[in-house]
């Protein structure tokens, strides 16, 4: 089975939209959900220190392959995991393990795609994703607590080195090119990978993006639930099977309940919730953060200089650097 390309993310670089385009285009056969068992194995085996490089790689397609279709593998879980724990060293090992598993497909393709974006806007999106997955806290707290993890996510120098061990045609393309000139983006992708250019553009959103008051309420609810679980988990008066089961079940379902609530609650219901939480308004700095010079220097070494060297797009990288400089000067 010949593969047109393997798309590994980065996370929060319009991967869901791209997968939607590929899924709806008649010329493309997509494996996205079909890769979820692979991603789950990578996460569990990496965390448990039992990764087997010789494990058979079974990939399912999201829909049956039709004659003449080109196969695309796309899952951002191949480049990022452990957002909940923020374990940078575990992520580094995970990325290596993922590249080893994908490397077994080198006889079926030499094409790997990594999409990237401005680090400042990416951090904002990662903070929102962290809240969507059950986390809590401001953007500034998120950056402070997960600095090493975020740098590892953006370590393009490391990722490119991993995949170039197995694949000859590893390419990087910017998120901004897709957002600012979609037709040209798909045409460029078709040219560099010799694959069909999709014509689908009207892709329904799989999950609504949250912002402002809704995102803040989500953070508060997640934080409250986490506090309650922690108290019960360490309680000396409430012990036994019921306690263990309750903590486990609530951890699994609570983030979904909170997420769906803030998606579907009316404005009045959100205001009422804020009142119960004794938080009448969203703090002005909830979604703002500043970047240290040290953090910016690391991004320059691992990310910006790599993008500039590989793409030659000095104008785009200059834009990224300007945004970083602004984030050093004042909260963004």
Region spans (language model):
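Anion-recognition interface
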Residues: 1-332
């Amino acid at each position: 089975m010949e593969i047109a390309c393997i798309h590994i993310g980065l996370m929060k670089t319009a991967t869901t939209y791209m997968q939607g385009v590929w899924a709806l285009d008649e010329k493309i056969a997509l494996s996205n959900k079909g890769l979820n068992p692979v991603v789950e194995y990578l996460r569990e085996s990496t965390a448990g220190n039992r990764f087997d490089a010789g494990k058979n790689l079974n990939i399912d397609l999201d829909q049956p392959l039709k004659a003449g279709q080109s196969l695309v593998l796309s899952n951002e879980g191949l480049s990022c995991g452990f957002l909940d724990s923020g374990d940078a060293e575990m992520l580094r090992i995970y990325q290596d393990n993922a590249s080893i598993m994908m490397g077994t497909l080198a006889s079926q393709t030499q094409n790997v795609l990594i999409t990237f974006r401005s680090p400042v806007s990416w951090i904002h999106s990662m903070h929102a994703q962290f809240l969507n997955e059950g986390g809590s806290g401001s953007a500034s707290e998120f950056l402070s607590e997960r600095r090493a993890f975020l740098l590892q996510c953006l370590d393009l120098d490391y990722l490119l080195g991993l995949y170039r061990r197995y694949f000859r045609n590893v390419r990087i393309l910017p998120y901004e090119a897709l957002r600012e000139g979609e037709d040209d983006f798909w045409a460029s992708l078709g040219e560099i990978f010799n694959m069909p250019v999709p014509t689908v553009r009207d892709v329904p959103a799989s999950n609504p993006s949250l912002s402002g008051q809704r995102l803040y309420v989500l953070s508060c609810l997640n934080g409250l639930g986490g506090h309650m679980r922690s108290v019960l988990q360490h309680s000396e008066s409430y012990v036994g099977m019921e306690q263990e089961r309750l903590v486990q079940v609530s951890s699994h379902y609570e983030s979904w309940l909170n997420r769906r609530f803030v998606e579907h609650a009316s404005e009045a219901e959100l205001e009422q919730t804020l009142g119960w939480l004794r938080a009448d308004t969203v703090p002005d700095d909830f979604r703002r953060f500043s970047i240290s010079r040290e953090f910016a220097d690391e991004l320059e070494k691992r990310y910006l200089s790599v993008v500039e060297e590989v793409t030659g797009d000095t104008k785009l990288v200059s834009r990224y650097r300007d945004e970083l400089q602004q984030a050093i000067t004042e909260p963004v």
